[in-house]
Amino acid sequence: MLFRSVKKMYPDYTVVAYINTTSELKTICDVCVTSSSAVQIVKNIENKNILFIPDCNLGKWVADQVPEKNIKLLQGGCPTHVRMSKRDVEKAQKAHPDALLLVHPECLPEVSELADYRGSTTGIMDYAKKSDAKEFIIGTENSIVQHLQFACPDKQFYPLSRDCVCHNMKLTTLGDVYQCVKGTGGEEIKLDEEVRIKAKRCIDTM
């Protein structure tokens, strides 16, 4: 695994991995984080030196809020969130000048820097529900726009980009899970037991 070589370059660093990483990668990481828990977990790590993987945009967002830490970033990223650009922001704000811009920290800095709010999907949804504003441009996976419109019918929500669709997220449906549990379809994924045990450690530490 290439990352083992990278880790050897930073032997005194605590390795923080985003939850959306492979099981194999989790086996050599110290702790997992979600976008909503990343800042607090990094703050609570005793070690000043942090190697944050794999999303450099999420990592930069964390680093900005925890300046007391020495955070090294790798050049990974979410292929869905990085599709959105400053041009998309300009276009959306021109179409909806009264709307607040709420974006996920996995977006490019050129997008995040223009936002009225940056946060996890849960954070975005909570902010929109509690806000007195009536219009919002949403810079994350487009299904969140639909969830918000259903939850807040008195407000208007617009996708920052109609291209912000995560096809990987949509590969597995509730029906697939149901069929798999029944044994009539779907696909059961089985992990090597050694990998499972090692990967579980950094999840438990979270």
Feature annotation, model-predicted:
Residues 122-123, 131-133, 140-206:
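C-terminal functional extensions of proteins
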Residues 11-14, 47-50, 97-100, 131-136:
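Short active-site oxyanion
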Residues 15-19, 24-27, 31-35, 41, ...:
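General beta-strand structural signal in soluble alpha/beta enzymes
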Residues 61-66, 73-117, 121-133, 144-152, ...:
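Redox- and metal-dependent alpha/beta enzyme cores, enriched for Fe-S-associated oxidoreductases
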Residues 6-10:
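Acidic (Asp/Glu)-rich catalytic clusters
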Residues 22-27, 39-42, 58-61, 79-82, ...:
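Short, well-ordered, mixed-charge alpha-helical segments that flank or form enzyme active sites
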Residues 40-64, 90-97:
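Internal active-site segments that recognize and position negatively charged phosphoryl groups
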Residues 1-2:
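Short, small-residue-biased leader/transition segments that mark boundaries at the very start
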